[in-house]
Regions:
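Short basic (Lys/Arg) and small-residue
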Residues: 139
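Mixed-charge (acidic/basic) macromolecular-recognition segments
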Residues: 5-136, 163-193
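Short, glycine-biased loop/turn motifs at secondary-structure junctions and
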Residues: 142, 151, 159-165
Length: 196
């Protein structure tokens, strides 16, 4: 299971008799969570990059996991609009580092839910002057769709996600890398040492 420490990684390489991460074929056999990442994990990602990503993912709480799923959907939509190609590992890491730059509305799963949320919480000032009897006539789905499209939000199975600020670039992203042994150490119990 991942993430693993750098020394656990080196031990695994030693057990399969390789020192080069390029010689290692890897695949994810089972996702316990984050299964929506599967289409974005490809053979160009090194085992060290994958380990760095899983290390970041292991730090996320439930709200942040939902934020990541929403951010990924937004990034995929952006790529589709710009013909930007596949999502890179650096983008996945950047998204995982930016989960706190979002609002997550856990009980909002549709345009209608979103429209009701915005109207009932006073975010649509243009509708505040309406008499209470007019609220029953509002098309909440249309209002929600307009708001979602204007703020480029995304629905996930766990709620609605919208960015609250611009995404920040990664701070000097450098995945774990292979470190060759610098010292080989043999340990033994001093009491069992034979005296000559």
């Amino acid at each position: 299971t991942f993430p693993v420490s750098q020394y656990e990684m080196m031990d695994a390489f030693e057990q399969i008799h390789t020192k080069s991460p390029g010689d290692v074929y890897w695949q994810v056999d089972e996702f316990y969570c984050f299964d929506y990442l599967a289409p974005h994990l490809d053979e160009s990602m090194s085992i060290f990059e994958f380990n760095s990503l899983t290390e970041q993912l292991s730090k996320l709480d439930e709200r942040q996991e939902t934020a990541l799923e929403g951010l990924l959907q937004m990034q995929v939509n952006k790529h589709m609009q710009e013909n930007g190609g596949p999502i890179t590992v650096q983008e996945l890491m950047m998204l995982a580092h930016n989960v706190d730059h979002c609002h997550v509305l856990a009980d909002v799963h549709s345009n209608e839910d979103l429209g009701k949320f915005y109207v009932e919480n006073g975010f649509r000032e243009d509708l505040d002057a309406l008499p209470d009897s007019a609220y029953a006539l509002l098309d909440y789905a249309k209002i929600g769709k307009q708001m979602r499209e204007s703020e480029a939000g995304a629905f996930t199975p766990h709620g609605y996600v919208v960015r609250t600020e611009e995404l920040q670039p990664l701070p000097d992203y450098e995945p774990q890398r292979d470190i060759n042994y610098m010292i080989r150490l043999t340990l033994m119990n001093h009491e069992n040492e034979q005296k000559t």
